């Protein structure tokens, strides 16, 4: 029987670094998480995962089966380095090839959702042409994802092009494809001048997962829970009232901390306490 509890996951970069997924999933299970989100960022080491052998892919599937901790989503931030909106045709082609490989990887190992970074370009100056190329790249990507039955979900970003659910919904309407949905980050959403509760309501029916982190205006990473501007309780209440029953993912970057597991456990307890106040989970 499927659990009726809210699925709570942890970002890979919150846990100790390394390539042994069996160890990582065992630790996540010990810490009480239902799933781990994989990172494929712009580093060569994590990009290399998209070229894993059949045996390496099977090892991940086996680790999921052995531990019962799922890997249902991938945070694909590699497009910072190889953006779909790049005016350099070779760079853009690499970005599309990364997308193709990521979708194939997801299909092979059972990942259901690939979270996309909403950057037309990141290290270059954006303009009308980069935005046009980005839209066309998304269209091509969603066509590939549709054939593979893998969902592409746009993150709400630390970048003006995609810093609200309203803006991401514009792309959803443009693409008009059920395999393109939204993956908001309540931290990023709160760090901008957004009516956060209205934005979450606007995304109703399109949100497939939610990133949970704290932020401050202009500071989008490594803000300890409770020290930023995010009204977690109200966000959780709004999502619950909108009918959202999907997964929540605690996003942290504690893999290089002295004791990552302790940092994660502290964050887990803090987030679950706010969820309990919002009536989503039972109080500990």
Swiss-Prot record:
InterPro entries: L-Ru-5P_3-Epase, L-Ru-5P_3-Epase_Enterobacteria, Sugar_Epim/Isomerase, Xyl_isomerase-like_sf, Xyl_isomerase-like_TIM-brl. GO terms for biological process: L-ascorbic acid catabolic process. Gene3D superfamilies: Divalent-metal-dependent TIM barrel enzymes. This is L-ribulose-5-phosphate 3-epimerase UlaE. Belongs to the L-ribulose-5-phosphate 3-epimerase family. It comes from Salmonella paratyphi A (strain AKU_12601). It is an enzyme of class 5 (isomerase). The keyword Isomerase applies. It catalyses: L-ribulose 5-phosphate = L-xylulose 5-phosphate. Induction: Induced by L-ascorbate. Repressed by UlaR. The lineage of its organism: Bacteria, Pseudomonadati, Pseudomonadota, Gammaproteobacteria, Enterobacterales. Pathway: Cofactor degradation; L-ascorbate degradation; D-xylulose 5-phosphate from L-ascorbate: step 3/4.
